[in-house]
Amino acid sequence: VATDMEIWQGHPGKVLGVREDWANRYPNTHVALVKALLEAGRYCADTKNHQEIREILASRNYLATKEEYIQLGEPSNYSCNLDKHVEYAHHMFFGDGLNRPSRTEHLWMMTQMARWGHIPFPRNWVEILERVCRVGTFSTASRELELGDLKYRRSPIQLFDDVAFDAEDPIGYLNHLGIERNFTIAEVHLASPTFVAA
């Protein structure tokens, strides 16, 4: 048995998704939503707040469980095997490079969907990434919170199979996988974005 962190260290945990027409119609609300999530992440990352968070999550309104079952940031030492215990950084709520949208990760997910036959790999993948993964909204929110413009440090994604994903060559990545299927490449036609004048 492997944990998700053993398969992909630092993988994205959650994704905020909104409809494009909503984001275009309510850009200020979109930025405010991202700011609220960043502030909540910063609050959750502060160990001074962990007891309060455990109490809230353990309450009947949420998980209805015992507080001691809820771990924030400090992995349990309980283990089911005799191997040396490895601790991974879990529940990373806030920090340098966290929470920033990653077009590299989005692109990797597109390659996986194409790899397993769920979608054709989009020939116009750059256009799709620019429409789907709007880094500008995050950058605006982080600047307004005076976090600075958090830069994404792009590095290859490497999973347990030791095949590095290079975002510069997604087709080459698909063609060099040990476990592979035939995949198709097709132009994905996107509707024109709708912008609302302020």
Where are these regions (language model features)?
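Generic structural hydrophobic/aromatic packing signal, biased to beta-strands
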Residues: 1, 16-19, 57, 113
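A bilobed periplasmic-binding-protein/Venus flytrap-type ligand-binding module shared by bacterial periplasmic
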Residues: 12-29, 43
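Conserved C-terminal helix/tail region of periplasmic/extracytoplasmic solute-binding proteins
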Residues: 107-198
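Secondary-structure end/capping motifs
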Residues: 26-132
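Short beta-strand->loop
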Residues: 1-11
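Flexible, active-site-adjacent loop/turn segments at secondary-structure boundaries
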Residues: 6, 20-21, 91
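Helix N-cap / beta->alpha transition motif
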Residues: 3, 19, 102, 130-138
